[in-house]
Amino acid sequence: MDVTVVGSGPNGLTAAVICARAGLSVRVIEAQTTPGGGARTLPDPEFSGVSHDICSAVHPLALASPFFSAYDLTAHGVRLAVPEIAYANPLVERPAAVGYRDIDRTCAELDDGRSWRKLLGPLADDCDGVVGLLLGDRRSFPPSLPAALRVAPRLLGQGTPLWRLLRGEDARALFSGVAAHTISPMPSLVSAGAGLMLAMLAHAVGWPIPIGGSQAIPDALIADLRAHGGELVVGEEVTEPPSGVVIYDTAPTALLSIYRDAVPTRYAKALRRYAYGPGVAKVDFVLSGEIPWRDPRLAQAPTLHLGGSRRQMALAESEVAKGRHAEWPMVLAASPHIADPGRIDSQGRRPLWTYAHVPSGSTLDMADTVTSIVERFAPGFRDLVVAVRSVPASQMSRHNANLIGGDIGVGANNMVSALVGPTPRLNPWTTPIRKAYLCSSATPPGAGVHGMSGFYAARTVLEREFGMGLPALR
């Protein structure tokens, strides 16, 4: 093989597709018995008509990622449902804060809609420029100077104590729930950057949900890989270096066990010092009916941030970053059947997907905690629970080896890691190991189902190893 890709997550498959389209022979090797990495969907072990998204469930970047946009997922058979409500944030003893696809409606329902519009309106008007900047390779001149000038002051405003300038407790909670996707202390530049991009995308393109589950995205990439002569092998763990060029969609530390003494001493030391971030505990529910939310608007919100107020979310993220369980942890929830009724089985059962933010490696079963938090905003929720599938953070790596300690970002979310990657290198997708490259979320631009880490790794490999440019993606 010209190129072997280890790991079949969205980044690995992106790199594989690009290399195959360039005319190279490509093989993808996946340790799990099913491909897709963080974008897999599997049937419930008891109720086969109900399927659970194993890691990611909602995909704000499916339409906006520069790679997915150029590749055109929909042209490759991925059907995306874009709900009217992108996300919402229930609040205690007051109406929820709701992020509609329509920014006008969002602002009309917030206490101070003008503040929200001032923050996000100009970004939504330049969606491509903003996404190109925030998902850039961190080494090129900003692709859009106007976008950079719009983002910079807002990044400082929401990534520092200046974030108090966003007015209205509901708006503050609405933004903080999105920023908390980074599982990092708030305010910070990292959480602000993610928050600005995701909140902006809600108004620019919406938060799409793949029909049939997240698996639709890797399935489309796999079909294209095979159409261009590539191969996929599942159920095979890589323990020795494959021949030829190898692109690793893995945690950086995996290279230590694969290459062992062949890892240069300084690089080995850097990898051993590599820091993983806080984790998530996964709790999937099978429900018999619709959740009885106090605020009826939430019945139309596929994505919910159940962290309470901005103050409560900031406290919870601070506690988790310090290695302590929060009394009220940040919980993300998704009801994909709201956008995709096909996720409801013939008996009316449907999935509820949730994550709870916890310290790295936590062994706690968070099912009761998550149930209590949902019940706080939807009395009677417990009565709907048919089954619970709970995975503590310490066990998340069993179904995805990259999620060490439950860290879905594959590395601590801080500004240094976001800019530099797993170790200080001019090109973070390279390694000092001959013909070995990285393309996981540990490399820029970081976590998320966007394919851009794989895109940049493939671009590097084509240029350095084969003297080739990027192929056509359509």
Role assignments for model-derived ranges:
Residues M197-V238:
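Helical element adjacent to the flavin cofactor pocket in flavoenzyme catalytic cores
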Residues D2-G129:
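N-terminal glycine-rich phosphate/pyrophosphate-binding loop and immediately adjacent elements
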